[in-house]
Amino acid sequence: MAQMLLRGSMSRVAGRCRSEFGDLPNWCLSTTTHHQEDLKKLGKILTEAATEDKTVIITTLNKAWSEPNSTFDLFLHSFHVGKGTKPLLRHLVVACLDEEAYSRCSEVHPHRCYFMKTPGIDFAGDKMFMTPDYLKMMWRRIEFLGTLLKLRYNFIFTIPFPRLSKEVDFQIACDRYSGDDKDIHNAVNGGFAFVKANQRTIDFYNYWYMSRLRYPDRHDQDVLDQIKGGGYPAKIGLKMRFLDTKYFGGFCEPSRDLDKVCTMHANCCVGLENKIKDLRQVIVDWENYVSAAKTTDGQIMTWRDPENCMKQWWWRNKTKQVLSENSKENYLNIMLFIKTYIILNFCLPMNNIRKFFFCFGSIFVNR
């Protein structure tokens, strides 16, 4: 579940698509993939939800995320516990990937739900990372965002305006940050981005979406990592910036200063249930932080470890490492690994809580 903010007008833009792939088709994002009637509905919702400066918050939603007490409920609750975020609910628009999500959204957040139809594909269930349906869902999102750019809407995942530059075309969060906001070796995270609607970004999203053909079986984030340092962004004059994890953190590299953190993303975590369990804990910890800035001993409050995500992510990566070793000792290695994991279950670090601040999508916590 990811969030974005849109700002702009509904003017249509005509622009040519360009290809750097030679014999690959010169594919172009087109609003013809969306029925005109659906576009009218989207335009009406955006107009009604927009602020005076035409700002709208958008999140994507499927059935798995919309179940009662799942991530969507936690996301809505975060507006109530974040600093100054409750009034923003009236500007929140939900792009639903399936009928069940649309029905649930209409119940809990009426008049702000848009059914983003995709004929022939069922996006209702929990799509595990890198499965075929997961890849389709991620690329469908990129296509949708490209359409929004053509409608001249800028979008951003959540709302930390003071930390964003108005002079940059494309700003995106990182799994890991090198310390240089212009370093193309920063590992990007597609869960948070601010993109200005102009011809450069329209061309870049066309190029990004088409690049899935050049890098098959990879998700949008991996493909972006491949193309961000190539010649095409420079050729079209795209201004790109990578956001500091101090303000835009995630589970991979947590934002540790609670006075500065704007958003936190649920990266480096596998499984919806793991995210939900640790999210509930994060909400409780945040509410405690807001109500009491310091603990009784004078120390700044910190966050409990997201144990469910920590253990599952460690297990996943270690399993991949062991299974990739083509040795006769594989079976023995796996057995020893399982025993080690069982022991580690009782030895996970519990004292350095700051190190493991975790959130999903972008729960509104500060600023």
Swiss-Prot record:
It holds the Pfam family Nucleotid_trans. It comes from the Eukaryota. This is Uncharacterized protein At4g15970. It comes from Arabidopsis thaliana (Mouse-ear cress).
